[in-house]
Amino acid sequence: MTKQQIEDDAISAFNIIQNGGIGVLPMDIGYSLIGGSSDSLMHIFETKGRTSGKLNAFVGDLTSADELLNLTPESRELLHLLTKTYDLPLGAIAPCNLNHPLLKTLDSRTRRMSVKAGTIVLLVNAGPFHAAISRLSRQAGYLLIGSSANLSNSGTKFRVTDIEPEI
């Protein structure tokens, strides 16, 4: 795919998610099932057969990570080293700034499903599509949240043809 095709697909997916839909999104770490509303997240949980004790992850870039995560200077340097210098994807689990305007937009149900003891998971640097949709999310001030595109406990899917029909 060309960079323009990736950008166009990211815009289409973001618009669907922002309007209450759910996207099956290609990431370097496998396909993800992403929503942005409480209802879409509930639908993801029900479709996957996910237990309520499992939390969602947020989708974001390094700028989002710098704003949302409360990291020590050493931890922030390590995050940048791994994702920017070594170009590795990372699910950063860290305390977050619950007073950040984006996190304050979460309703109580979404917060219960995505934040535990002031900590979130933020997926950073998971490929070109992830970069494009993360940028759109940050620019629009609209959080993207979800998990892997599979039935619960069935393993990550790296090919769209391996995603279960229920998903």
Label each region the model flagged.
Residues 1-167:
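Active-site-adjacent structural elements in enzyme catalytic cores
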